[in-house]
A protein has these predicted regions:
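Alpha-helical scaffold/interaction cores of sigma-54-like transcription cofactors
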Residues: 1-455
Length: 455
């Protein structure tokens, strides 16, 4: 994120929304990192919010956690739906003031009362309270916008995506709806919107001047896997890989190889193995291969089914010798450099499939072995044409049968999935549906808008 912004001439400002917990209330504040120390504190608070919370509640930090790790962080208080807004509407004004005073004392000039104007219910009451609190507590105001999409015409697409996530219907009038003001406003619009509180807008325009920090590129820090025999991960990788190759040649490779000379087979495989080991060690990834090998061997030993390997990782002979994969890359003419080569910037990534019913046992093993060195990561995917049709069709209230009929008009080709627009262009029945049914036209319009929103 930071590198891409820097390349287009924009300085990144790194921040995160963190939940706070106090007085029976949980809600968000926004924190921004001024320095590398601030960035460390931000990531620590994010981790603490998950580590200290039980599964029945939202991840959140205690006020003491925030105070103890506030160095080089800037705090914005959020809107009427966030932590301080919730305290106000729950009539916990005493707790509001106590916490604000504690934060003001510790954050000093690094705290702002946030003002947001989205033309939403109860927004004005909270704003008036914040304006008065700003004067009495001498905490500066900052005008901000909660942006969910770029352009104003993306409101309906965002609303549809929200309904998909919440399993609601668009026509349900009892659900919570955001206003249509959550788009990225232009400079002139902000000047007009906050003309009565120019100091809040000025603090917004000058906010970026408080930041010169940019996270440095770092290589992953992996646990060192070695034993007394090997002294280093590199030596341990070589030892295990060579032992594994001997086992593979003896039990599998000789029986299947078209080459009948055992010495010739050994030379081909040993040359390839040494080539791969040299590349892996030169890139400091020996520990990664050993870690993956260890938990796969553990899973197999504990009767947890593991896939044979897929993706470019199946091209590694080292992986085959370490039991990470069960595919002989030389037999199938697979290329190691597709998985790892000195020109590859990012870390290698094995695609490992575990039995769905027992995969949690693998997580538990990793947590017991590496303690707080283990974390889950989030991934984002795009909806394929058929799934997008089903999801948006459902929130529009179309019947299952109708949506299913539309989905069957989308050609299924796993090798080259068609976009929705390509399917519509190829299928005349789609055009008939659009012509005869306003809801189907709405469905396709929303799908086009959601596609633009994602892109």
């Amino acid at each position: 994120f930071s590198e891409k912004l820097s390349k287009v001439g924009t300085h990144p400002i790194i921040g995160s929304q963190i939940n706070l917990k106090a007085g029976g209330t949980i809600g968000k504040v926004t924190l921004y990192a001024k320095t590398n120390q601030g960035y460390k504190n931000l990531t620590k608070l994010s981790s603490l919010s998950y580590l200290k919370s039980n599964q029945s509640e939202e991840p959140a930090c205690e006020i003491n956690d925030l105070v103890s790790n506030n160095r080089d962080l800037i705090l914005l208080t959020g809107n009427q739906r966030d932590f301080f807004g919730k305290l106000y509407y729950e009539n916990k004004i005493k707790i509001f003031n106590e916490i604000i005073n504690v934060l003001k004392k510790n954050f000093e000039n690094r705290i702002y009362f946030e003002v947001q104007r989205h033309n939403e219910i109860d927004e004005k009451n909270y704003e008036n309270f914040i304006l008065n609190s700003s004067k009495s507590l001498k905490i500066p105001l900052i005008a901000t916008q909660e942006v969910f999409y770029i352009n104003e015409d993306m409101y309906e697409a965002h609303d549809a995506l929200k309904c998909i996530g919440e399993k609601n219907f668009i026509e349900d009038n009892n659900r919570f709806k955001f206003s249509n003001e959550h788009y990225l406003k232009k400079h002139e619009e902000l000047l007009d919107l906050y003309s009565d509180i120019p100091e809040a807008l000025e603090n917004n325009f000058n906010f970026h001047l408080r930041f010169s920090f940019k996270p440095k590129k770092t290589k992953p820090i992996l646990p060192s896997i070695a034993n007394a025999q090997s002294n280093s991960p590199e030596n341990e990788l070589q030892r295990q890989a060579k032992e594994g190759l001997e086992n593979r040649i003896k039990n599998f490779i000789i029986q299947k190889s078209k080459i009948k000379n055992e010495n010739e087979i050994k030379k081909i495989y040993e040359d390839r193995l040494n080539h791969e080991i040299n590349i892996i060690n030169s890139m400091d990834y020996a520990s990664y291969f050993l870690i993956v090998s260890d938990y796969i061997k553990w899973a197999k030993k504990n009767s947890i089914p593991v896939g044979p390997g897929r993706g470019s990782g199946a091209g590694s002979l080292v992986a085959y010798c370490l039991d990470i994969t069960d595919l002989d890359p030389i037999e199938y003419d697979l290329i190691f450099e597709r998985f790892l080569n000195p020109d590859r910037i990012s870390m290698p990534d094995f695609d490992i499939d575990f039995c769905e019913e027992k995969r949690d046992k693998v997580f538990e093993y990793l947590k017991s072995k590496y303690k707080d060195g283990v974390a889950h990561i989030i991934t984002f995917g795009k909806l394929k044409a058929r799934m997008a049709l089903r999801d948006v069709g459902r929130v529009l209230g179309l019947s299952y049968g109708h949506v299913d009929r539309l989905c069957k008009m989308v050609p299924f080709d796993p090798s080259r999935p068609l976009t929705l627009q390509e399917s519509i262009d190829r299928e005349p029945r789609f055009k008939e549906e659009v012509k005869n049914n306003p809801k189907v036209k709405k469905l396709l319009d929303l799908l086009e808008m959601t596609r633009k929103k994602v892109n």
